[in-house]
Swiss-Prot record:
The keyword Translocase applies. Its EC number is 7.4.2.11. Its main location: membrane. Part of the ABC transporter complex MetNIQ involved in methionine import. Responsible for energy coupling to the transport system. This is Methionine import ATP-binding protein MetN. It comes from Albidiferax ferrireducens (strain ATCC BAA-621 / DSM 15236 / T118).
């Protein structure tokens, strides 16, 4: 549905141009929710605005719904943009128009007949749960309701793609969950392809099928959300995940491990960080490892979460025993689908 090929984008700057995007390659499949996450200034907004050519890339090609946007004339590009809806962080509603009229605006500008506009807007307001507020003005509704108006307006022309530019970052957590739930419902009910950018890994966790991590204008990692959570490869990804699934051990735990090392240096053991997902999360693997390999195992830290219906868990464990048994235990865990990260106790 969307393909970005070797995209670079620079802005004028002094003493040298600012490189916002560098060699970006992305492919978004039809009907999926694709997230792009990164810190402030990483290039997220620049990237999403390249998709509909609000930012024209300095280099590369943009393909959306079978058309190469970067090769289109101005008039053909305007027509192609009808296939791409967009919602924004600050809603961008017209304060002088009612909820109904804000949603109707793109249809009016396209010359749609009034009777068809009324039918389409009624349908959309029902979809986003705002039929009762149709005559209200933006100043009379909440932030979450304003974003629902923005979503309805973005869907007015029946686009194939919806772009979400930090659409929930100005909302409280409960309203954010509600808006993300609405986007997921629209995606599932209508097969709409959604690309959303965010700096919050919680948003990715709740709604995205796949995710790309952007850092300093480059895509540093991408994949299925469950895979990225369980097998993060890049330091930026690990730090973003750590914000919602912290891995830092309490100082009291670190002190206890070091005391064990000092008391029994010949059995100082090993610190393992384990990540598991799906069916593996329900299997009694640790008790099996203890029995099979004769190890002492102490759980230091752990948590279990849910990523769109898939159980995901992480554990930090201190394992002590013979070196050969430790090696075999790690191999056994990995063969069972557990992601195992070995750490030196001295570096904890």
């Amino acid at each position: 549905m969307i393909q970005l090929k070797d995209i670079s984008l620079s802005y004028p700057g002094h003493p040298a141009p600012v490189q916002a995007l560098q060699g970006v390659n992305l492919q978004v499949r039809a009907g999926e929710v694709f997230g792009v996450i990164g810190r402030s200034g990483a290039g997220k907004s620049s990237l999403i605005r390249v998709i509909n050519l609000l930012n024209r890339p300095s280099q590369g090609q943009v393909h959306v719904a079978g058309a190469e946007l970067t090769a289109l004339s101005a008039s053909a590009l305007r027509a192609a943009r009808h296939q791409i809806g967009m919602i924004f962080q600050h809603f961008n509603l017209l304060s002088s128009r009612t909820v109904f009229d804000n949603v109707a605006l793109p249809l009016e500008l396209s010359g749609v007949r009034p009777a068809l506009i009324r039918a389409r807007v009624d349908e959309l307001l029902d979809l986003v749960g705002l039929s009762a507020l149709r005559e209200r003005y933006p100043a009379q509704i909440s932030g979450g309701q304003k974003q629902r108006v923005g979503i309805a307006r973005a869907l007015a022309s029946k686009p194939k793609v919806l772009l979400s530019d930090e659409a929930t970052s100005a909302l409280d957590p409960e309203t954010t969950r509600s808006i993300l739930g609405l986007l997921r419902q629209i995606n599932r009910d209508f097969g709409l392809t959604i690309v959303l950018i965010t700096h919050q890994m919680q948003v990715i966790k709740q709604v995205a099928d796949r995710v790309a991590v952007i850092d300093a204008g480059r895509i540093v990692e991408q994949g299925a959300v469950i895979d990225v959570f369980t097998r993060p490869q890049h330091a930026t990804t690990r730090s973003l995940i750590d914000e919602i699934l912290p891995q830092e051990l309490p100082l009291s735990v670190i002190a206890r491990i070091r005391a064990l090392m000092a008391a029994e240096p010949q059995r100082s053991g090993q610190l393992l960080r384990l990540a598991f997902a799906g069916d593996g999360s329900g299997q009694p693997l640790l008790s099996d490892v203890i029995r099979r390999f004769g190890l002492d195992l102490n759980i230091l830290h752990g948590q279990i979460d849910d990523i769109q219906g898939q159980t995901f868990g992480s554990l930090a464990v201190h394992v002590r025993g013979a070196s050969a048994q430790l090696v075999q235990a790690v191999a056994h865990l990995r063969s069972a689908g557990v992601v195992v990260q070995e750490e030196e106790i001295a570096h904890v």
